[in-house]
Amino acid sequence: MPNYIKADQFFYPHGVRRGGYLELVDGKFGKHVEQIPEGAEVIDYTGYSIAPGLVDTHIHGFGGVDVMDNNIEGTLHTMSEGLLSMGVTSFLPTTLTSSYEQLLAVTENIGARYQEASGAKIRGIYFEGPYFTEKYKGAQNPAYMKDPRMDEFRAWQKAANGLLNKIALAPEREGVEDFVRTITGEGVTVALGHSNATFDEAKKAVDAGASVWVHAYNGMRGLTHRELGMVGAMYQLPHTYAELICDGHHVDPKACEILIKQKGTENIALITDCMTAGGLEDGDYMLGEFPVVVANGTARLKSTGNLAGSILKLKDGLKNVVDWNIASPHEAVMMASFNPAKSVHIDDVCGQIREGYDADFIVLDKDLELVATYLDGVKRYQA
């Protein structure tokens, strides 16, 4: 027999449904109804809102786990379970620019065992690199940066059992257009970033099939009135998604607002770019091969002081854009769930409350603070 969630409002892609009940059937979402059968079991969240579980499509680590360490038990358990306390129920473990062999080993482990994740569900693998440009290397190792090669990608995808569903590259690398055209034709999402590309170079990559901008504004050629660069292309080119880190450190809130106005909330995917120190205390950590200092809400390279990923919680990024008065609660929820899922073509399994989908959802209070996280209709985290 189904049970029912009672709440003040429910966040759907098309808008907010107020009152009523959401049916749960065998761990799946059912219908939204106004009346329920007599004697039905009710999960009462009167005074609260129900939103889809959040989807983090760019995250390198959490809780002491770094995806690049290839500690598969840590990724499957420590990281995936820890993310439930962040409101995240689906994620893409994200790599860094590294050697062909190390990336092969990481993908092989995740591809073989991703279904064993005991918390947030692994919905794919995101390769952030290695086909980047040294000038905008960020916290990535330029020693491994190079032009894209189909033989490498094929080997990684085979090792991943087809789970590699997103890869980021710099549009100005040699052979990008053919590479992008080929892999997007196979359903892989191509993101553009860590790049010194001109507007025209970026546009050619988008015309070939690229559709996401990596951590907007960061690691990309800026806009001037003579050369629009990557930022100008991100603003101007339609039907593309911009990843956005809303921690108040990576991007000024006003710049976030400009981007949202340029692209529309439906084309913004909130991400964390979180590294191993997420959920932990300030101190010294590693991001891949690089020593990092975490303090005052940021993670920075010891060598240069440059930002090195973040320690942002996705639930806080959602709340920030509302507190900054640049998005409504419904828009913010969609930017942290439905939009990122759509951006990598996994909205057929997650990112929205929809009949037949896994009942992965979160409970929010009136201030958009996380109250609880559910997986398959079962409460897995209580604030």
Regions found by a protein language model. Name each.
Residues 1-51:
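Histidine-rich, glycine-flanked metal-binding segment
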